[in-house]
Regions:
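Conserved alpha/beta core of the MobA/IspD/sugar-nucleotide pyrophosphorylase nucleotidyltransferase superfamily
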Residues: 63, 78-156
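ATP-binding glycine-rich loop module of kinase domains
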Residues: 146-175
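Active-site acidic catalytic loop and adjacent metal/ATP-binding pocket
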Residues: 150-153, 300-352
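Conserved HxN/HPN-centered segment at the entrance to the catalytic loop
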Residues: 184-197
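Active-site catalytic-loop/activation-segment of kinase and kinase-like phosphoryl-transfer enzymes
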Residues: 247-307, 390-396
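Active-site activation/catalytic loop segments of kinase-like enzymes and analogous catalytic loops
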Residues: 344-403, 420-435
């Protein structure tokens, strides 16, 4: 391109010289890019070329005008001819399009997307991202609390969800994909359209259906009784089709590793973080005007002997691992449902972890916190707009009633401790990826831990 520019300027200098106005290449640069660049007054008497031969002035005018006329004439060509010309001259290989790779539905989604994929820390993945998503339009970002990205996309054939991740997160997503394939004959799960694992990247596409919505939305747009019935069906199906057929005895070594990694490891990360270290120095916190014991004041809850005794009685088997409200998908046109986004690598694979995840939603209000944009911290005070619906309260009461009827009190206490540990496991991710709101999720951990402590000390018999 630059050689063509220089060739054009050199030819113009030679032509003007022949036409009676001696010009060097440097003079052409001065004419085109100097103070009076593209000033046609230069052709008039008194201008830079006002005294030049008429042929030189007409030549310069033609040099400017003829390309403009050619571009205008190209717009008059038949559409088929113009399309063929565009295809022949495009820079990208035929069939490859990068025009619609930003989320189209929401401006905030576009900003987050650009920050995530074109920040310096992600530049190694940009090429793979472009190759993976050629020929599709990204409509909306549905990513939640993980390092994988979920986008609503469309191509020339259909609309679908695409989930993908790179590096270690890609390996984790590949484990999720293996779980979905292994359990597809046992459980109602999302339909996988296609997938690929290569070069440190994993992705898969899921069927999109406008009548399928997350249970959070379903719960707040339908009678609570319908959501209660679906949730009971989900738990009964998991019990009969997954937990019981895969049941094995509890493994003391895995319980020990679970405590060491998921409890001690995450507590250590909290104590080492500068912002949380200051918050954790107080004996109590005032969260939205209510006083709670701070986490260090509840350290007896994380005593190893206590946890070993609690978890030794846990049932063990294959589990979903991330049974939050948003991972239960409900159909609005009938009473069916299916599950998405399992989580592997929990070490202590107990159904009680699934129940704990469900309580992280219904008791801890995780989904409402995810929709809360900001938090204020001053000394030992943490304030944010915590919204909670009557529908959540009703569903929590139903779940606690079912758990209390099915399990003795000590096992319900174990389920509640797994909820606390889920909040504990969430914190390093929030400190790394969502630091501005991390104090709010720490407050969620503290509030849940206080409720569970009261239950363990028999100060209350239920959470609601």
């Amino acid at each position: 391109m630059w050689a063509a520019y220089l060739g054009s300027y050199t030819a113009l200098a030679a032509a003007l010289t022949v036409a009676g106005e001696p010009m060097r290449l440097v003079d052409v640069f001065g004419l085109l890019f100097g103070r009076n660049a593209a000033d046609f007054a230069a052709l008039l008497p008194g201008g830079a070329l006002g005294t030049a031969a008429p042929a030189a002035r007409w030549l310069l005018l033609a040099w400017f005008v003829l390309p403009l006329l050619a571009m205008w004439a190209a717009t008059l060509l038949p559409e088929g001819v113009r399309g063929a010309m565009n295809q022949a001259t495009q820079a990208a290989p035929a069939g490859e399009s990068y025009l619609n790779l930003l989320p189209q539905a929401d401006e905030h989604d576009r900003a987050v997307f650009l920050s995530r994929y074109f920040g310096l820390e992600n530049k190694d993945y940009v090429k793979r991202f472009l190759q993976m998503n050629r020929g599709i339009t990204i409509l909306e970002d549905y990513s939640a609390g993980s390092n994988a990205t979920t986008m609503l996309c469309m191509d020339t054939q259909s609309t679908f969800y695409r989930k993908y991740a790179f590096g270690k997160d890609g390996a984790k997503l590949a484990e999720q994909l293996d779980w979905l394939r292994a359990q597809q004959d046992r459980l109602p799960l999302c339909d996988i359209l296609r997938s690929e694992e290569a070069d440190g990247c994993c992705w898969y596409d899921m069927v999109y259906n406008p009548q399928a919505v997350g249970m959070f939305r379903y719960l707040h747009s339908n009678p609570v009784e319908k959501s209660r019935a679906i949730l009971r069906a989900v738990l009964a199906t998991l019990e009969d089709k997954l937990y019981k057929p895969t049941a094995v005895p509890a493994d003391a070594e895995k319980i020990e590793k679970y405590i060491e990694t998921k409890v001690d490891g995450n507590l250590k990360k909290l104590h080492e973080d500068r912002m949380l270290r200051e918050l954790m120095s107080y004996d109590t916190l005032r969260i939205n005007g209510v006083e709670y014991k701070n986490l260090p004041a509840l350290d007896w809850m994380f005593d190893h002997d206590r946890l070993r005794n609690l978890f030794a009685k846990d049932p063990v088997g294959t589990i979903h691992g991330d049974l939050t409200i948003e991972n239960i998908i409900c159909r609005t046109d009938n009473d069916s449902w299916y599950l998405i986004d399992p989580n592997t690598g929990n070490l202590h694979e107990s159904p009680f972890l699934d129940y704990g995840k469900l309580l992280q939603s219904l008791h801890g209000s995780y989904e409402f916190m995810m929709k809360t944009p900001r938090v204020a911290v001053q000394d030992n005070r943490i304030d944010f707009q915590l919204t909670r619906s009557a529908a959540y309260d009703a569903l929590l009461a139903a779940v606690m009633e079912d758990l209390s009827a099915r399990y003795p009190r000590e096992q319900v206490e174990s389920i509640l401790m797994h909820e606390v540990i889920h909040w504990l496991r969430l914190m390093p991710y929030k400190l790394n990826k969502d630091r501005k709101r991390a104090a709010m999720f720490y407050a969620g951990l503290v509030m849940v831990a206080n409720d569970v402590a009261d239950f363990s000390e028999h100060k209350k018999e239920t959470l609601c």
